[in-house]
Amino acid sequence: MQNDIKIKERAYEFAIKIIKLTKKLPKDTGGFVLGRQLIKSGTSIGANVEEATGAFSKDDFIFKMNIALKEARETNYWLRLIRDAGMLKNPEVEDILNESKNIKNILSAIVKTSKERR
């Protein structure tokens, strides 16, 4: 349960960082398209974690957390693409990319533990 609260707060703070980061992307087609994808996946993590906390059953909880995990993986992909394409300075992206990896690891652990306790 403590992990659930921790991930809920981290995912919310992460979404705010994602929103702020996308404002710094280039104002061109690439920046717009990748920014939109990043906003969608990066803010969806917390939304799905929030839904999971109100799940009707253990299976529903696992399902929602799995969706959050998939969104975290997608977010990680977009961040790597932005970094490797040189759209933003490396240190700026690296910090949020590390947080993305941490969130992904926490979600993986929650899903694994929840499945084992099913």
Model-derived regions: residue spans:
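Short, C-terminally biased terminal segments at protein or domain edges
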Residues: 1-118
